[in-house]
């Protein structure tokens, strides 16, 4: 199992797990430490248990072993934020056009979804950049054909939710929150989920869908109960204050 230990340590640290947590009841902490340093071997069945303990699929692990590099889709996501937050519509248009060319060349559906995501960001900056109903339907189909949502899908939803109908926001929000395997033990993913649900909550309040709003408020209270993140808790207080304002102004 050459290099397996080193790769396992990479994923363990990436996902924020201690040696003790990763070892669990599958192996001793010292055995796992030696395995990561390449000093001993472990059985295949034990190895699969360890991967499960740190929430890493065999497919992702194998990809990493094959000199896994950051994918073009990761590069795409990384380039979006600085252009969006600087209101650089020209930069976003360039990214969208590049993704469209890749779609036309390869036929890969995700490139088409990427162009819609960028169009959604452009729409947030300038409402003259319209996202068509057909494009939104493509996104809906894509999401509910995916058996497992990862950070890409949550980011996609977070960038387009303002265009969704309220019933659909509630639906995808429930789907996200019920897929606890995605965010329960991984801090980065949990932050994405909290951010998305804060936006869903605010959007439901804005549109006077109080039953849906109450659902997201209840879930967020549980998610943030033991959280030390100041920004998320401050945002929660802001939306909570907005709810009080709406109630008192009626």
Spell out what each predicted region is:
Residues 73, 109-116, 148-155, 187-198, ...:
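Start-of-helix signal in alpha-solenoid helical-repeat scaffolds, especially tetratricopeptide repeats
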Residues 16-33:
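Short alpha-helical DNA-recognition segment
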Residues 7, 78, 114-125, 155-159, ...:
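"A position-specific structural signal for the A-helix of alpha-solenoid helical repeats
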Residues 1-14:
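A short, Lys/Arg-rich alpha-helix, primarily the initiator
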Residues 97-104, 138-145, 177-184, 215-226:
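Amphipathic alpha-helical segments of tetratricopeptide repeats
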């Amino acid at each position: 199992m050459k290099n397996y230990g080193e790769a396992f340590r990479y994923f363990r640290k990436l996902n924020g797990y201690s040696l003790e947590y990763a070892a669990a009841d599958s192996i001793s902490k010292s055995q796992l430490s030696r395995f990561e340093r390449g000093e001993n071997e472990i059985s295949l069945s034990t190895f699969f248990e360890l991967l499960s303990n740190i929430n890493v699929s065999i497919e992702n692990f194998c990809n990493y072993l094959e000199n896994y590099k950051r994918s073009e889709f990761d590069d795409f996501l990384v380039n979006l934020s600085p252009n969006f937050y600087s209101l650089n519509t020209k930069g976003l248009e360039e990214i969208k056009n590049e993704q469209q060319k890749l779609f036309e060349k390869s036929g890969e559906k995700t490139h088409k979804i990427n162009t819609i995501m960028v169009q959604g960001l452009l729409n947030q900056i300038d409402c003259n950049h319209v996202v068509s109903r057909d494009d939104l339907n493509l996104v809906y189909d894509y999401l509910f054909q995916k058996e497992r949502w990862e950070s890409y899908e949550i980011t996609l939803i977070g960038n387009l939710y303002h265009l969704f109908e309220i019933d659909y926001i509630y639906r995808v929000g429930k789907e996200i929150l019920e897929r606890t395997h995605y965010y329960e033990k991984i801090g980065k993913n949990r932050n994405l989920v909290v951010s998305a649900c804060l936006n869903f909550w605010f959007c439901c309040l804005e549109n006077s869908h109080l039953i849906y709003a109450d659902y997201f408020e209840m879930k967020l209270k549980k998610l943030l109960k033991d959280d030390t993140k100041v920004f998320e808790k401050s945002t929660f207080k802001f939306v909570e204050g907005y709810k009080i304002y709406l109630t008192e102004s009626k």
